[in-house]
């Protein structure tokens, strides 16, 4: 992650750098992104930028964390213990829908987050993003296990398989939305996001709940 002094950078300059980086990573992915283009768009010199971040990987980690905060990808106020069998799936659906709607005017925020998927497992585990990835995985796993405890997510299959199913549907839905973003209204985004959530529910619901 960036050096501690990055947080002392003037908020307007910090946001300008992170927004430029988000646009670049969303457009070109991590591998194709150019730190020179980012710095030019943000009106930063290399000397100034490297005073705050060590390299492109460091800047990417900071950008991902910032994008996640901007769209509230992880809901810090979520109380898993308060969820019931009746509120679990509506809450799940809302938690998927709302970050997408918050991205509606700035789709590059979501696009930059999607660029994380291009990194190999070793980089995700050991690189600057390791802490953020661990928090995200714990968030998702906590949600899955709460659903199992409530009896609304099946518990007869390995967690890894259930997560793989959910991830595949989530990625497919998000990729389609991003590819068609400019033609979609907020209502379209919400409706399609909810359809994907419904498919995710059907994929992991216990057999006796599949038609619920």
Predicted features along the sequence, with ranges:
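Short secondary-structure transition hinges
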Residues: 94-141, 160-163
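Hydrophobic/aromatic-rich alpha-helical bundle segments in the mid-to-C-terminal region
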Residues: 110-115, 126, 130, 148-196, ...
């Amino acid at each position: 992650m960036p050096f501690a002094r990055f947080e002392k950078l003037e908020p307007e300059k910090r946001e300008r750098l992170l927004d430029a980086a988000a646009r670049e990573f969303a457009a070109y992915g991590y591998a194709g992104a150019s730190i020179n283009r980012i710095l030019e768009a943000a009106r930063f010199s290399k000397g100034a930028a490297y005073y705050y971040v060590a390299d492109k990987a460091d800047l990417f980690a900071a950008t991902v964390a910032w994008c996640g905060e901007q769209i509230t990808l992880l809901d810090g106020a979520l109380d898993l213990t308060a969820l019931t069998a009746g509120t679990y799936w509506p809450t799940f659906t809302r938690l998927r829908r709302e970050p997408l709607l918050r991205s509606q005017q700035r789709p590059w925020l979501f696009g930059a987050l999607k660029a994380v998927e291009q990194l190999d497992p070793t980089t995700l585990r050991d690189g600057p993003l390791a802490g953020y990835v661990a928090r995200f995985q714990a968030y998702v796993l906590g949600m899955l296990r709460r659903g199992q405890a409530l009896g609304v997510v099946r518990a007869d299959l390995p967690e890894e398989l259930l997560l793989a199913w959910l991830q595949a549907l989530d990625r497919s839905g998000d990729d389609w939305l991003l590819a068609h973003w400019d033609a979609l209204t907020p209502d379209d985004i919400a409706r399609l996001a909810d359809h994907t959530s419904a498919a995710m529910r059907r994929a992991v619901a216990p057999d006796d709940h599949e038609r619920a």
